[in-house]
Every structure is written in C-alpha cells, then in structure tokens.
C-alpha cells in the first residue's frame, strides 16, 4: 500500500522524514536556541515548494526583530503569511506554525481541536522548554504529534513517525 507524502526534500526530509498532508510537529528548546529561526526557515521552504503557510508569531509579534529575521532568512514569499494571532479560519493554509504555544496560552485540548477541525492542514507547534531542557506542557503534547524537533544550541534534532530522525545546524 502506498501513502502520499507532501514531497519534502533536502535538509527537512533528513530532519523529520517524509510527512503526509495534515501532519503535526512539536518544536521545543530553551530561549535563544534557534527555535524561531529554524521554524521561519522551514516555513519559507514549505511556502516555496508546498503551499500556503501561516506563521502565527504570537510570542514575538510582527516587530523589528521578526522583520529582521524574515529579511536575514530571505523568508519573503507570496505563500508565506505572518500574523500576530491565530485566525479563526485556517482553511486556506496548508501549514500553520504557532510560535509559541506557551505564550499563546493554547492548551492541549485546543491544539487537538485545531488538528481535528483542519485535517488537511499541517501544524507545527513551538514550545518553550524548562530549565532542565524538557518541553513545557503535559506529556500528552508529545504523544499527540507525529514528529518532535528539539533545538539545542543552534542544532535541531528530529524524531518521529516518518522513519528518519536526523539533525541539522540552525545558525
């Protein structure tokens, strides 16, 4: 039996494998580890090659530092939309990044409802981590997603259901 994937290639396929439409992913790490930088670059890649992307910059907002990151990463594409919140209607997006779940005060039930209500949309949830390096939130968050990316000191480590767990430099 064959299953259709989104056709992910390059460094992101090496990091998380070959996800299908509607996948979900958790990204976590300590402050200033490179989470947002990696996710903006991933959003850019998805917008350039795979469809419409919403990047909900709840934590940082659309201010000078976000504008600087977008310019530095050359993350300007007609399919990449930046918002300071999560719009009620997400049907026009193939991929939605929520940066961050912690700052947006989105609980696990709300995350599951987003996924359930938008089955063809992939969600990438960004979480803060504790001083010990574990992600904030209940363990159910990790069980409910298809892949997990830990960003640690500028290096992203992926693992999940798509057969590959790799690593890549962020900075």
Where are the language model's segments positioned?
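N-terminal pre-Walker A segment at the start of P-loop NTPase domains
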Residues: 1-14
């Amino acid at each position: 039996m064959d299953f259709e994937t989104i056709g992910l290639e390059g460094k992101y396929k090496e990091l998380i494998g070959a996800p299908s439409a509607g996948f979900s992913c958790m990204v976590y790490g300590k402050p200033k580890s490179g989470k947002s930088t990696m996710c903006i670059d991933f959003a850019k890649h998805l917008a350039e090659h795979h469809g419409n992307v919403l990047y909900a910059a709840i934590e940082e907002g659309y201010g000078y530092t976000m504008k600087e990151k977008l310019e530095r990463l050359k993350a300007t594409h007609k399919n990449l939309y930046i918002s300071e919140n999560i719009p009620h209607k997400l049907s026009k997006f193939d991929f939605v990044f929520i940066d961050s779940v912690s700052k947006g005060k989105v609980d696990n039930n709300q995350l599951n409802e987003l996924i359930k209500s938008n089955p063809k949309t992939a969600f990438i949830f960004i979480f803060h981590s504790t001083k010990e390096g574990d992600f904030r939130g209940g363990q159910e968050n990790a069980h409910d997603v298809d892949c997990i990316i830990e960003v640690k000191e500028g290096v992203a480590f992926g693992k999940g259901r798509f057969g590959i767990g790799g690593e890549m430099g962020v900075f």
